[in-house]
């Protein structure tokens, strides 16, 4: 693979609509193979480096199991295992690590870190999560919606809660995939427009009232009130976000067959009630599982391109 052919997945907008149509189709195929216990090893002897500056259950398990199921291997590295944790420049780490593996996933803090890493990498780099964006999770959410309700184009998605990496990724997805996003965040926790492309403006609408944001929604989604790195603000956030808990009353404003999603881990009684997350409209377990399947399709696509079969 030459430098000119390398593609990275650092933000949702890095792929086109056609790319997503292909990856979602491949996700369905790979999931069926998984459910049917079919052996499929297109990435035989390929190695995935997983660099974690932020810990995770779902991200590590889904990527590690995913590359193994495709015939490859994974190497886990935390800041204790790399020179990144000891002050080595990101650019130097990228040069070294990318000479020894075939693909890299990074879960870190600032988007700038993964951007600089990718600019100096000889192999594809995947964003496993940054403070600004979480494209793999939203891709899994999109596939989950597709499984349950069909294409998301023209539908309405409601976001209730913090203006975090999930929300900024949903905004990018709305523009590329052609759906409407209605969002509501508490006063003092508003959208940072510097993280939003001007082209995305027609695809989202901001509401002060979370119930109004959920009106007619086909999908209602939320996340924790206190993301990793903001623990010192936890008590203040609990007070500020009290009216942004997705409960049965809020869901009643959505479409009658609306789905509920949460990227997990969830705090029942805070951002969502047990009645909603454990209720019939919730698809959070399918959503979590689908991280495995979309990331397998993503790695296959980044390493092999479009397959004819």
From Swiss-Prot:
<dbReference type="Pfam" id="PF02729">
    <property type="entry name" value="OTCace_N"/>
</dbReference>
<feature type="binding site">
    <location>
        <begin position="134"/>
        <end position="137"/>
    </location>
    <ligand>
        <name>carbamoyl phosphate</name>
    </ligand>
</feature>
<feature type="binding site">
    <location>
        <position position="107"/>
    </location>
    <ligand>
        <name>carbamoyl phosphate</name>
    </ligand>
</feature>
<dbReference type="InterPro" id="IPR036901">
    <property type="entry name" value="Asp/Orn_carbamoylTrfase_sf"/>
</dbReference>
<dbReference type="GO" id="GO:0042450">
    <property type="term" value="P:arginine biosynthetic process via ornithine"/>
</dbReference>
<protein>
    <recommendedName>
        <fullName>Ornithine carbamoyltransferase</fullName>
        <ecNumber>2.1.3.3</ecNumber>
    </recommendedName>
</protein>
<keyword id="KW-0028">Amino-acid biosynthesis</keyword>
<comment type="function">
    <text>Reversibly catalyzes the transfer of the carbamoyl group from carbamoyl phosphate (CP) to the N(epsilon) atom of ornithine (ORN) to produce L-citrulline.</text>
</comment>
<keyword id="KW-0963">Cytoplasm</keyword>
<feature type="binding site">
    <location>
        <begin position="56"/>
        <end position="59"/>
    </location>
    <ligand>
        <name>carbamoyl phosphate</name>
    </ligand>
</feature>
<dbReference type="InterPro" id="IPR006130">
    <property type="entry name" value="Asp/Orn_carbamoylTrfase"/>
</dbReference>
<dbReference type="InterPro" id="IPR024904">
    <property type="entry name" value="OTCase_ArgI"/>
</dbReference>
<keyword id="KW-0055">Arginine biosynthesis</keyword>
<dbReference type="GO" id="GO:0006526">
    <property type="term" value="P:L-arginine biosynthetic process"/>
</dbReference>
<dbReference type="InterPro" id="IPR002292">
    <property type="entry name" value="Orn/put_carbamltrans"/>
</dbReference>
<dbReference type="Pfam" id="PF00185">
    <property type="entry name" value="OTCace"/>
</dbReference>
<comment type="pathway">
    <text>Amino-acid biosynthesis; L-arginine biosynthesis; L-arginine from L-ornithine and carbamoyl phosphate: step 1/3.</text>
</comment>
<feature type="binding site">
    <location>
        <position position="165"/>
    </location>
    <ligand>
        <name>L-ornithine</name>
    </ligand>
</feature>
<feature type="binding site">
    <location>
        <begin position="263"/>
        <end position="264"/>
    </location>
    <ligand>
        <name>carbamoyl phosphate</name>
    </ligand>
</feature>
<dbReference type="InterPro" id="IPR006132">
    <property type="entry name" value="Asp/Orn_carbamoyltranf_P-bd"/>
</dbReference>
<dbReference type="InterPro" id="IPR006131">
    <property type="entry name" value="Asp_carbamoyltransf_Asp/Orn-bd"/>
</dbReference>
<feature type="binding site">
    <location>
        <begin position="227"/>
        <end position="228"/>
    </location>
    <ligand>
        <name>L-ornithine</name>
    </ligand>
</feature>
<feature type="binding site">
    <location>
        <position position="83"/>
    </location>
    <ligand>
        <name>carbamoyl phosphate</name>
    </ligand>
</feature>
<dbReference type="GO" id="GO:0004585">
    <property type="term" value="F:ornithine carbamoyltransferase activity"/>
</dbReference>
<dbReference type="GO" id="GO:0016597">
    <property type="term" value="F:amino acid binding"/>
</dbReference>
<dbReference type="GO" id="GO:0005737">
    <property type="term" value="C:cytoplasm"/>
</dbReference>
<feature type="binding site">
    <location>
        <position position="223"/>
    </location>
    <ligand>
        <name>L-ornithine</name>
    </ligand>
</feature>
<keyword id="KW-0808">Transferase</keyword>
<comment type="similarity">
    <text>Belongs to the aspartate/ornithine carbamoyltransferase superfamily. OTCase family.</text>
</comment>
<dbReference type="GO" id="GO:0019240">
    <property type="term" value="P:citrulline biosynthetic process"/>
</dbReference>
<feature type="binding site">
    <location>
        <position position="291"/>
    </location>
    <ligand>
        <name>carbamoyl phosphate</name>
    </ligand>
</feature>
């Amino acid at each position: 693979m030459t430098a000119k052919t390398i593609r990275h997945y650092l933000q949702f907008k890095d792929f086109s609509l056609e790319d997503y149509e292909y990856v979602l189709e491949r996700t369905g195929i790979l999931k069926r193979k998984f459910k049917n216990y079919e052996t499929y090893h297109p990435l035989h002897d390929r190695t995935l480096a997983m660099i974690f500056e932020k810990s995770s259950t779902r991200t590590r398990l889904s990527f590690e199991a995913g590359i193994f199921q495709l015939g490859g291997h994974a190497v886990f590295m935390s800041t204790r295992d790399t020179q990144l944790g000891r002050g080595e420049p990101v650019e130097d780490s990228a040069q070294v690590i990318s000479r020894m593996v075939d693909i890299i996933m990074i879960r870190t803090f600032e988007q700038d870190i993964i951007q600089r890493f990718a600019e100096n990498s000889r192999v594809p780099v995947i964003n496993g999560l940054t403070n600004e964006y979480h494209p793999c999770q939203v891709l899994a959410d999109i596939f989950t919606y597709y499984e349950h309700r069909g294409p998301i184009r023209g539908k309405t998605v409601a976001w209730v809660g913090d203006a975090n990496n999930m929300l900024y990724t949903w905004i990018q997805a709305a523009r590329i995939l052609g759906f409407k996003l209605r969002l509501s965040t508490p006063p003092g926790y508003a959208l940072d427009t510097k993280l939003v492309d001007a082209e995305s403006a027609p695809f989202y609408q901001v509401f002060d009232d979370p119930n109004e944001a959920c009106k007619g929604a086909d999908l209602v989604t939320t996340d924790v009130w206190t993301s990793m790195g903001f623990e010192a603000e936890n008590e203040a956030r609990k007070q500020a976000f009290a009216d942004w808990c997705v409960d049965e009353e809020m869901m009643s404003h959505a479409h009658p067959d609306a789905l509920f999603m949460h990227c997990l881990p969830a705090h029942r009684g805070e951002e969502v009630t047990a009645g909603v997350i454990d209720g019939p409209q919730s698809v959070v377990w399918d959503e979590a599982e689908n991280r495995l399947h979309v990331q397998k399709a993503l790695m296959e696509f980044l390493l092999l391109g479009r397959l004819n079969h």
